[in-house]
Amino acid sequence: VKLAVFLGPSLPWAEARRLAPGATLLPPARQGDLWRALRRRPRAIALIDGLFEAQPSVWHHEILDALDAGVAVFGAASMGALRAAELGSSGMIGVGRIFGWLRDGAIRDDAEVALLHAGREHGFRALSLPLVNVRAAAALARERRVLTGPLAQALIESAGRIFYQERTWPAVLAEQRWTRRVRERFGALALPDPKAEDARACVLEAARFAGSGALLPVKPRAQAESSLVRRARAWDELAVAQARPDAAALADAGLRRALLAGWARSLGLAPLEPDLARARLRIRAGVARDEAERLAQDLA
């Protein structure tokens, strides 16, 4: 195997086969899949799509191990762009516009590339709209003078408030207070698909490398803190917490907080900025929430 490509909703497999006829196509990567791919002894790996949330995501260490083995690892479009932005200094090769946005800090949230998609039997068809596509559409609309700067920003912000599994163009456009003329002009645009564009570029670049005799440039591996060290420190902190007289109450509060956070994510809920600001202030002041609420009532 010269090239292994982890690909799902970003680009149809049929198109990837046309771009790189000899490539081995694999479904979106989950934790451990790059280690398994190394058994095929590829010259290059193109990491495009990957699983998250319900499945453990691709681990940084498996990418670093591939690089240490002399395998070129390219990343783009989705999970690949995220990991390439994080591991570019270690030798992973990022490709495309989304990678550039992440590398330069224009976007920071992993949720920007998240979407809901069908399974392999349905060709990993995208069922929702990633926020990066809305950003690209807003930029195009502003460039073509269809949207003003404020309207383009409002389009992105309103799309970001919709839970990623429920975000579609009809849902996003229903939130916009545009004139009929603006809607008609926006509807006439050929909306970009940066995920597909970046995936194509990544497959082509990885295929060119895999088919050449080029060697991977050697870069010093960044010394990441071992997971064993992190786990040992976590156990130490847990032992200190368990020795406290209120350990049971702390455990109950932590479990409740984790369950509520997971429930909120499943409903697509996110805290408002004023709530976040108050929480940050309480943390800096070292004041518990119930104490802050009692103080607010006393001052009212």
Question: Across the structure, where does each feature detected by a protein language model lie?
Answer:
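Charge-patterned, long linear interaction tracts outside catalytic cores
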Residues: 132-186
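A short, well-structured beta->alpha microelement
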Residues: 22-37
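Short, basic, glycine/proline-bearing loop/turn elements
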Residues: 43-52
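General beta-strand structural signal in soluble alpha/beta enzymes
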Residues: 26-27, 46-47, 73-77
